Amino acid sequence: MFPAKITFKADKTLEQRMDVLKFVTLSSITLLLGLQSAGGFAHDTAYAPTPSNQRAIEFPDTNKYKTLAIDLHIHSVFSDGHVWPNIRVAEAQQDGLDAIAMTEHLEWQPHLADIPHPDRNRSYQEAAESAKGSDLIVLSGSEITRDLPAGHINAIFINDANKLINVEGAAKNSTDTEVFGKAAIKWPAQEAVEAAHKQGAFMFWNHPNWSNRETSGITKINTFHAKNAAEGKLHGIEVANTHWYAEAAFQTALDYDLALIGTSDVHDLIDWDYLPHEGGHRPVTLVFAKEKTAASIKQALFARRTAVWFKNLLIGREKDLGPLLAASLKVKSMKYQTDTVIAEIEIENTSDANFDARYTGPYSLGLSSDRFQLPAHSTTVIEVKPGKRLKALELPITLENTLVTPETHATLVLKAALK
């Protein structure tokens, strides 16, 4: 049966949901009330309070590019999600995102009887209309949904989602989820990929390590995806989705020159799934773009200039992550304690990451170990004992909550000097 093969996230229990709701912050409540007062229930422009520092995802620009936080895998009631698209816009505004893509399943339509929509562009149109007047960019997209070998593939920057699905006969107008779905997946996945490619879509392989798709639970690229990657029809791969990170997917990205993608794949509320009111955050893709426009985001994605922010873990190629780390961590000052040769070095972290640092230099630190934390959006003073007063010091560090390969952490040299 179609629903048994195409399996999606299980619903939380009522008790779990009620427990989470008890802790929803005032800003989240204000968001929902604001939607009502702003005509949100008529699907008008979304309203969201100004994002707080505790919730907004913030990373500095690098010396060459703007750092944009985007979520390229989102669902609404127009497929198997449980909210209207304007709620997705409001959530993204609360999270301080720069762009989102509405990516409804084309074939899996559990709400079809209640929300029939022969035009599969409606989710994007609703979200784009809701975001008018804000600086949030809404991108068009769809999720091509099949069993292996294709699995699930997101196509972003499409012009017409209707051309990515082909249902023939009586099933075309059916509101029965199973009847429609079984008919929809008969159209070869490769033809859907070709249709998206003709529209200039950026395509990436979704949640490649799902155990119900690959029995080992380990990402293994198959002939279908390898061929499309070689032909320039597969451009990225999710290395993080919802609550998992797949190191094998990271290695696949490196081996096949695919963009690193991290997504929420949200179906319920962001507040339920990621608990931002308790310090959590949705997984996002950090795109290093020349400017904040849809065209620039598209260019950066095709150029593979991305990193992933997932559960306080930064994942990226060294060429992309290095400049971001250099922009995030800077030495503000250096001085010596009175009548000593103990240097105090003040390090500022302007990013959302709570960096777990390990000092790898030759000097002793005024700590119990060579490991220390550099908390997000704060300044930390580190004592260094060089043995004599030097005008300048270098602090080589390894950042253990970063990955530039599946087994390698990023390194950075902080340079301090007396003024």
Residue ranges of model-derived segments:
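Bacterial N-terminal signal peptides that target proteins for export
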Residues: 6-27
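Charged catalytic cores and adjacent phosphate/nucleic-acid-binding surfaces used
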Residues: 41-70, 85-89, 151-158, 216-419
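Short catalytic/ligand-binding loop motif for oxyanion handling, primarily in non-cytosolic enzymes
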Residues: 109, 147-149, 211-214, 269-271
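Aromatic-lined carbohydrate-recognition surfaces of secreted/lumenal glycan-active proteins
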Residues: 201-217
